Amino acid sequence: MLFRSIPVSFYEKDVNRLFNTVAVIDADGSNLGIYRKTHIPDDHYYQEKFYFVPGDTGFQVFDTAYGKIGVGICWDQWFPETARAMAVKGAELLFYPTAIGSEPILECDSMPHWRRAMQGHAAANLMPVIAANRIGTEEVVPCEENGGQRSALTFYGSSFITDQTGELVAEADRKTEQVILATFDLNEMQENRLSWGIFRDRRPECYGDICK
């Protein structure tokens, strides 16, 4: 028995296709299913389009022993549509396993922006967000495929948990592996979502332009 529910990221091969995938393992050890990453980045340091195809599962919500969770993967977290899609499917908590780091080409620290994007998802959907990011440095070794470039990407950790208003309630630092914890009353949060009326007052028939 695990006595906890865990999203587990892995690289999945399906015949001749590769996916960036997460499986959700429930407290009794059962596999509740998988989600395949929807948004695939293509950047100097995140060249996933060379390897992965876009996911075909659609956004998923998993009914775990401790509540209904939605899971997006890394680049998915920058799209508000990801969070809202999981929210309208009944998610009570949003999880984002992540591998993001310094932006040497842009010469900026994207960590605060990264956090604020997901704090906004929490506030807009009135549910906690849990983001787990890796630490450490990976070096790019010169080769023919990358034009002989040598570079390095330092992942900035800073994993965090927000409450349903987007306020940070737990956070890790940039350089060490840490376990962070928070406790939520799902019934209380559901009452809070209902009292705000955000989902009651949605007008999906007016949102067609964002799907173009």
Give the location of each predicted region:
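CN hydrolase (nitrilase-like) catalytic-core segments centered on the catalytic cysteine
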Residues: 3-7, 68, 74-179
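Non-catalytic surface loops within mature trypsin-like serine protease
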Residues: 26, 186-188
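Short helix-loop capping/hinge motifs at secondary-structure junctions, enriched
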Residues: 30-33, 167-169, 190
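Hydrophobic residues at beta-strand termini and immediately following loops
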Residues: 35, 62, 132, 172, ...
